[in-house]
Curated annotation (Swiss-Prot):
Catalyzes the conversion of L-lactate to pyruvate. Is coupled to the respiratory chain. The active site is at 275 (proton acceptor). This is L-lactate dehydrogenase. Substrate binds at residues 24, 129, 164, 278. It comes from the Bacteria. GO terms for cellular component: plasma membrane. It comes from Salmonella choleraesuis (strain SC-B67).
Amino acid sequence: MIISAASDYRAAAQRTLPPFLFHYIDGGAYAEYTLRRNVEDLSQVALRQRVLKNMSDLSLETTLFNETLPMPVALAPVGLCGMYARRGEVQAAAAADAKGIPFTLSTVSVCPIEEVAPTIQRPMWFQLYVLRDRGFMRNALERAKAAGCSTLVFTVDMPTPGARYRDAHSGMSGPNAAMLRYWQAVMHPKWAWDVGLNGRPHDLGNISAYLGKPTGLEDYIGWLANNFDPSISWKDLEWIREFWDGPMVIKGILDPEDARDAVRFGADGIVVSNHGGRQLDGVLSSARALPAIADAVKGDIAILADSGIRNGLDVVRMIALGADTVLLGRAYLYALATAGKAGVANLLDLIEKEMKVAMTLTGAKTISEISGDSLVQELGKSLPAALAPMSKGDAA
């Protein structure tokens, strides 16, 4: 198969992966309205083409948390990467490291912190949920610090699991799920050999290290469901801020007031995110939420964004809407499932090339020159009437 764009990796991943794994990452919550809008809204952000600007000295470099990055991109935390490729977290981290961008290890990774961190040169980031088991949280933070992780990404939009109906049909959960997964693996021999057999153990490495026993897929679903904490508030984050002395990023912000609270709390960054449409269906797409948040806190805190980003053009759009850096999730996982480290490396090269084309044709020589002036109109004003936000008089 010819891979010429990030979308090609999605098609290839669907052929490679057992359905329960493909649909787990490809799907969203409820009817997947927000999942679709993440992509659709971003795709309709119209860029302002400029010409004859002498773009020979174009640069994608940016600075984030006192580090220079070759482009404003990092790999987002994605659970179960090690089920999508053999020791998937190690391969994805290696690709990010070679490119010089951050890799974020998920709490629910297959490969534990101690397996991934020594394989790369630059410090990785670590993502943590707020869980009932504060002992696990402290243990994870201590291990992340010991491994040299530089930045903590604290996910706050999962006080309760989202309702992901697709998982019940695909075999990730629901009746007879284990049997469905077995037969799906049999029908996908390449994955079964490379990952299913040779990619073992499939423990949730960070959780197994804490519990002192193996944890499989069923444990993942049950342990997380029982440990999400709906009582979470900003006060619960105070002891983490005291414990963690590196940059701390709050992931899951969609409202300007929550962004202001993050500034008051003393966070170093936020991620404008709806969890890729996997939590509450019907909330704003990240592209729609971002401009108001940028208006509220730009310059006071680093603004990262995810959800709906599929290519380099989308990266430029998010920067123009107000982000400082973006996180890639699904896009890199499709590439990882298709071709491992080489797939992720190629995806990052594609995104870099697409960004250079977009910046050249919008007259932005540097990342700092990408702004609202790079857009024809702000998102919402340039959308077709059917997609534009309803006025009060239009509301049913």
